[in-house]
Amino acid sequence: MQKLEIKGGRKISGTIVISGSKNATLPILASTILTNKKIIITNAPILRDVETMVGLLSTMGSTIKLNKKEKKIEIFNHKTLKTFAPYHLLKTMRAGVLVLGPLLAKYGMAKVSLPGGCAIGPRPINFHLDALKKMGANIKIKNGYIVASAKKGLKGCFIKFPKISRCYRKYINSILLCKRKNQIKKLCFRA
């Protein structure tokens, strides 16, 4: 591991502004589906994936104000949202699957396009789908879409990952509204 060592006789002080994280902003945006209250996200990095997620939520019925200069996103879900996330909006990003859990938790159904391309390479979503199935969701893959329902709602359960995972946000989104205690094992919270 590399380090930067500064030697000198003077004390260094000051402040820096840390930019927001795309990988934190995307699940936060998806989780706004769960509330009808106005949500304001500040210090949001306005990158292509964030703009795509904003476009998806807008298409689903969210009222959204995006201020690129202030890096601020205001979201208000004052009406019932559509539970359909089309391919043409999700073909360029993987994070579209993040809306699946909140849609199931709030509306009991969802039809979400399978994730689009990723520069890192293929990253399966089977852990996410298996966890939702364990929580009571009925999930089928039809014509490139995840078709899911949870007519009795999502139920808490014990989830053991087959390996350590950094994709905990997906699961946290899904389990927040479950009616009983949840347990997840082998979950890594390192950045």
Model-derived features: positions:
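Structural preference for solvent-exposed beta-strand-turn elements
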Residues: 1-191
